[in-house]
């Protein structure tokens, strides 16, 4: 009983904190230079990370298996992954405007997980035989981490497309720290070198110069984050193949989950390939990543909604009052 109470406390506290963090970040975007609010939001995300970690540890102890056996637990883990991505720039002592993506993503996933739709999964259950393996932690954790990274990178690409194809762009704030330090851990020199070429040209306005810088930052970091997610996805698929061979006697069975995982891998492999061609970088590669954003959600929720295939153990049914 005490473990269930702790789970309830951790989930509601983390959800409340991340809601406050989003409000604070909206205020900092509208009113530039409020250092106190920015620091408070960063501390709030750290508290959110600790609360979600506490939930996962509590459920792990209570259920006696790694908490990634169903959609409810994977959504909580996905929210935890978003909080990790959020804190990486903070560890490197850089301004973190990735929170405009990670904080809403965390509250969306956690809000859906704690909603009434997944009530039947809130209670931990005994693992089905197919999941009683040491590969559970390796395979599922890598897949969920890849979803988090690929979703963040895809959202950065979508933001790039919105800014690039919008005729009139308003940059938040007057300072250029949003453009120089928002998404970089030290690669701002790369952007500065490219932007110095444009600084001396007469046909670009002051606004277009900073607009170009922002687009370059988004393009650079969408590539970095998606590359990391692609590595996680590859490891997850390979470990899943080994696990499938042990559990079902075949490395690949082409069930819906595996098929969409392969499609997801292919889409982002195409994205990385376009990055090797300078003529396809920027908007072209961002379009591919934007398509990948939709594919990820189909891969993640598709089988759970259909409830068919070898991965149907994580499916759920919509509950009604």
UniProtKB/Swiss-Prot annotation:
Q: Name one Pfam family in it.
A: Cytochrom_C_asm
GO molecular function terms listed in the Swiss-Prot or TrEMBL record = heme binding
Q: Which PANTHER family match?
A: CYTOCHROME B_B6 PROTEIN-RELATED, HEME EXPORTER PROTEIN C
- Which family does this protein fall into? Belongs to the CcmF/CycK/Ccl1/NrfE/CcsA family.
Q: Where in the cell is it found?
A: Plastid, Chloroplast thylakoid membrane
**An annotated GO BP:** cytochrome complex assembly
Known InterPro entries for this protein? Cyt_c_assembly, Cyt_c_biogenesis_CcsA, Cyt_c_biogenesis_CcsA/CcmC
HAMAP family annotated for this entry?
Answer: CytC_CcsA (MF_01391)
Q: From which source organism is this entry?
A: Platanus occidentalis
Name the keywords, alphabetized: Chloroplast, Cytochrome c-type biogenesis, Membrane, Plastid, Thylakoid, Transmembrane, Transmembrane helix
Protein known as: Cytochrome c biogenesis protein CcsA
Look up and give the membrane topology term.
Multi-pass membrane protein
Summarizing the function annotation, the protein's role is: Required during biogenesis of c-type cytochromes (cytochrome c6 and cytochrome f) at the step of heme attachment.
Q: Which residues cross the membrane?
A: 17-37, 43-63, 71-91, 98-118, 143-163, 225-245, 258-275, 286-306
Subunit structure, as described in the record? May interact with Ccs1.
